[in-house]
Amino acid sequence: MARLLCFVLLCGIADFTSGLSITTPEQRIEKAKGETAYLPCKFTLSPEDQGPLDIEWLISPSDNQIVDQVIILYSGDKIYDNYYPDLKGRVHFTSNDVKSGDASINVTNLQLSDIGTYQCKVKKAPGVANKKFLLTVLVKPSGTRCFVDGSEEIGNDFKLKCEPKEGSLPLQFEWQKLSDSQTMPTPWLAEMTSPVISVKNASSEYSGTYSCTVQNRVGSDQCMLRLDVVPPSNRAGTIAGAVIGTLLALVLIGAILFCCHRKRREEKYEKEVHHDIREDVPPPKSRTSTARSYIGSNHSSLGSMSPSNMEGYSKTQYNQVPSEDFERAPQSPTLAPAKVAAPNLSRMGAVPVMIPAQSKDGSIV
């Protein structure tokens, strides 16, 4: 009975060890974004495996919306690595001779989209074997900033904050005091591993240099801050100064506006006065006045004559003297007045008057 059991065990071991097998165990791999992930896949062949060697790596993305995709393939002594666009140029076999039993690959410049399940499949008829590896890509903490939220005055309440710009969860925080006794204040001990420390009733003993370290499974980052707890400032003086400054600014603005308004009024007044002043222009000279003077003197002479002697004068016609702006109108020929003897004129009370001669065109000579 014992011999039969040993025979069965030996047969099982022989069957288990025969044929193609992948010796690398399945495992979970965690790497940081931007790093290189090494996915191992080592295999052994048996004499019975006589067919062509085919090696392929497949990926099942973490979103589970895409079926398994081939990312790199070895077949017919050739390598094909352009099947999966997201990993094109970033996946390579680590061995120059994969037939030696090493089908491991490197995935460079890891991105969050590379997260998923990778499968190594080796085929050499009649043997077939495969192993799966879970790749997780994490982001290192970076860009961490330490700052004080509040007024750093004695008796005040404020907060010390430690905030990384990026980093995959879970994140761990640790505060330390780097100056003086390097001992954290007792009220803060409960929050030494928190991203925020709440400071109550601050005292000058809290002043010093502090550091905050944040880390996750793939990396860490650190920031520092200087805390200076000072006596309260003179708020009344500050408020009074602000009020006085505001009033002075308002007065200055008012003065500027007043000056601008006054200047505009002066300019407007000067402009109106300038438009109201007109220079008197003398009227154009006319020859009509000369003619009128002659006619007036002639009428005076005729007024001293008797009605019987004015018969010749009543028929005399004078044409109107045109202005310089118009052409002179043609004149009708004038009749010579009747002659009266000098003794008759004297008896009539006439006074001798010199009458200027008149040309045919009406002008006085």
From Swiss-Prot:
Glycan-bearing residues: N106
Start-end of Basic and acidic residues biased regions: 269-282
Annotated disulfide bonds: C41-C120, C146-C223, C162-C212
Spans annotated as Disordered: 269-315
Residues annotated with Phosphoserine modification: S297, S304, S306, S323, S332, S363
GO molecular function, one term: cell adhesion molecule binding
Bias kind Polar residues: ranges: 286-315
Post-translational modification note: Palmitoylated on Cys-259 and/or Cys-260; required for proper localization to the plasma membrane.
A Pfam family annotated for this UniProt entry: V-set
Any single biological process term in GO: gamma-delta T cell activation
Keywords, ordered alphabetically: Cell adhesion, Cell junction, Cell membrane, Disulfide bond, Glycoprotein, Immunoglobulin domain, Lipoprotein, Membrane, Palmitate, Phosphoprotein, Receptor, Repeat, Secreted, Signal, Tight junction, Transmembrane, Transmembrane helix
Domain notes: The Ig-like C2-type 1 domain mediates homodimerization and interaction with JAML.
Quaternary structure and partners: Monomer. May form homodimer. Interacts with LNX, MAGI1, DLG4, PRKCABP, TJP1 and CTNNB1. Interacts with MPDZ; recruits MPDZ to intercellular contact sites. Interacts with JAML (homodimeric form).
Protein's UniProt name: Coxsackievirus and adenovirus receptor homolog
Native organism: Mus musculus
Gene: Cxadr
